[in-house]
Amino acid sequence: MSRPRISYVDPATLSDAAMLAELERCRQEGTPRPESQAIRAHVPAIFWSFANSWRDVFKNGVADHAIKELCRVYVSRSVKCEYCGNQRSVKAGREGLVEEDYRDLLNFETSTRLSERQKAALAYAEAITWDLPADDKLWQRLHRHFSEPELVEIGYFIALTMGQQRWLRTLDIEHHQVMGGTSASMAPGFETEEALKRSKAEAGYWAGSAAKARDEAAE
């Protein structure tokens, strides 16, 4: 696998017990897994800024976690962040999200699986990610399904994950490179380094050249 554009901080060189505990949590729970945090660990304040925001806004918060998870992976599929897009939230899975739900993301409006509430949140993610007009029709739709605190949290989260994913995709980071040995939060077919390589080599891989050609043809 390629080397990242910015080096990982080796956990063995860290003396901060709290940072080590957070990296171990990433190893055991995922989303995020350790690699992205091992990059942020170059600046401890950034490491903790992300960890705390992710805990408070994504893992917890006032809006449904599964809806935020769909928005997260919608962003991954849109900006082609493979590192983020090949992870799945374990908590969202416990709340009923299944792999088939992710497959409809880029065509969410015509999905027969996703609810109207989920589609409204994804329309919000679409507008933010692609700089689309946020007209009265969109906002009426959003207010029909969400409270104002939920809209603040979902919008803030989409902006947070979009910025991080646009950055991370430039770094060439990959799973199973830092504190490996677990499959925590990996998407099906990406649980080990060997499985990841096989899945990324498949013709139907979501971020592969064939998928890119399909997306461009659909535009």
Predicted feature descriptions by range:
Residues 105-116:
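Acidic/His metal-coordination segments adjacent to aromatic residues that form catalytic metal sites
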Residues 40, 54, 70-75, 105-106, ...:
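Short alpha-helical scaffolding segments that buttress acidic/His motifs in well-ordered protein cores
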Residues 45-50, 80-84, 128-136:
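Short acidic alpha-helix initiation/capping motifs at coil-to-helix transition points
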Residues 85-104:
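Iron-sulfur (Fe-S) cluster-binding segments and ferredoxin-like electron-carrier domains
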Residues 117-157:
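Acidic/histidine-rich alpha-helical segments that form the ligand environment
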Residues 148-198:
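Preference for long, well-ordered alpha-helical segments
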Residues 1-65, 93, 186-219:
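Mobile cap/lid helix-loop segments that border enzyme active or cofactor-binding sites
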Residues 68-89:
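Short, thiol/selenol-centered motifs that function as redox-active sites or metal-ligating centers
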